[in-house]
Amino acid sequence: MLELKKKHLILLAILSGLLLSLAWPLRGFPFLAFISLIPLLIIVEQIQQNSSKFLLFASFRYSYITFLLWNTATTYWIWNSTEFGALFAIIVNSMLMSLVVQVSSFIRQNMKNQILGIIILPILWISFEFLHQDWDLSWTWLTLGNVFASHIQWIQWYEFTGVHGGTLWIWIINILLFFIINSIISKKEICKAGRNSVIIAISVVFIIPSIWSIWRYKTYDEKPNPVDIVLLQPNLNPYTEEYKLSVDEVMERLLSSKARSIIDTNVDFIVAPESVLQEGMFEDEFCYSISVREIKEFLKEYSPKSHFISGAGTFRMFKPDEPLGPSARRYNSTMWYEAFNTALFIDSSGAPVTYHKSKLVAGVEQMPFVHLIKPIEKLAIDLGGTVGTLGKSNDRTVYYKGVVPVSAVICYESVYGEFVSEFVKNGAQLIFVITNDGWWKNTAGHKQHFVYSRLRAVETRRSIARAANTGISCFINQRGDVIQSTEYWTQDVIRNKINANTEITFYTKHGDFIGRGMSVVSLLLISVSMVVYLFNRINHRKTRLSK
């Protein structure tokens, strides 16, 4: 086998990171994802075949170059909101990704099965992506399947698999191409039949999903069930305005003259962005809220049958005998309260309905592992509004008072496919995404977040109305097409009709079944590998003692 020098491996690690970065939305070319992991696979194979010449954790060290470059190039924009948060997210996420590669090398070394060795890494990787969704350091922005977010014609089959199907697709093609390239590097003779088999496999794996997806995209017809929606984009600067303007000034921006000219009695829903109402509202005292009162008066005057959905910072007092959770904050010597990032559902007459954001941003909306580090919660990064560990909703709330059942997904929650599908399983026929992306300024961050909503539309076959404080606000149909959008960092109001849907997709019904399956297989692989490792260590020790 041709042995590459260590400097060549470093170059390969850099190449893999560059290819992953250049594939990423919004300006990237996603086809590059199909070759982006080949350099990394070559590195892993080189280390595996020449393990005696490499230091411990060599797989981790080389792959860390790849993932640090990729994470930095695609999520650098976090720096605009928090320097510490950016460094933490980039460094730790790169370490976790590299750890996956290192664990795969450990398993390969113990299992000593060539065929199994090749497929261990994608199995572990998909398991990592799946498990990374549901812990305190969750950061799923760079799930590989997200790479196709701006090219939804290729991935209409996400309605069956979700983004983990895209991750699997990328890994399979990379591995098949790696077989060919590795045979060249290894100077192995491949029979014509074997080479043709690999080429056919690559063609089948790439072409069949692509053709089916394009056909599905071209032939998908939405059942007519139009819902009239207005999106408000007040463009409040989160650094200088949103948390400093008076309630009256915020309401004047939100319910602008343009909004008043566009909204009439035919509008079904009016949607405002995340955290736009920062009045310090206690949830048992909404009747005293100036913001809620003004919205109700606005509805009565302009559109009495409409329903108003808006983000807000709200609070709830704990009852005297109520157990205190990790989000509890001291109000005074005897009373406790908790804060929420809330979606308010308001009509012209009844009390507002609330949904509390449940996928919280680590370090901003919750301190990771708060049960262990409650004393240092005051270090939570302050981005305005409510900070520290926030309270959550245990249920995926569906609002039934309007013409169709709807749900509001708050900001970061829209990145989680299975999470969003739970609202649909609970009855939502439309999804509203309310967000405030102004923290990241005019970078790739808000654009990536915008196109990720297109993936949720395909997965659930739900039309999406997205209200973003500074943009991009938009309407997305059930195929994932953006049918109308605003410009970034402008004050605007747009109105359109999108179709509600009652059908449940395979993905909505079964969720991330690929990730669950891979996690079970990974657990088995790691367990067997540990047993083999310990058995070998015992035998080695016995052999040494016998001598």
Enumerate the language-model features and the residues they cover.
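Membrane-embedded alpha-helical bundles of multi-pass enzymes
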Residues: M1-Y217, N442, S453, I483, ...
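Non-cytosolic juxtamembrane linkers/loops
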Residues: L4, H8, K187, A201-D264, ...
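Short, conserved active-site loops that position catalytic residues or coordinate cofactors/metal ions
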Residues: W24-L41, W70-A73, Q233-P234, N266-E283, ...
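Active-site catalytic loop in hydrolytic enzyme cores
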Residues: I78-F84, L131-V163, A328-G417
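CN hydrolase (nitrilase-like) catalytic-core segments centered on the catalytic cysteine
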Residues: N93-L96, P122, F269, V276-L277, ...
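A conserved mid-to-late transmembrane alpha helix and its immediate loop/hinge
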Residues: F160-G165, F315-R316, Y412, T460, ...
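Soluble catalytic regions of membrane-associated enzymes that act on cell-envelope
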Residues: S213-G363, V398-G402, A408, Y412
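Short, highly charged, low-complexity non-transmembrane loops/tails of multi-pass membrane proteins
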Residues: R544-K547
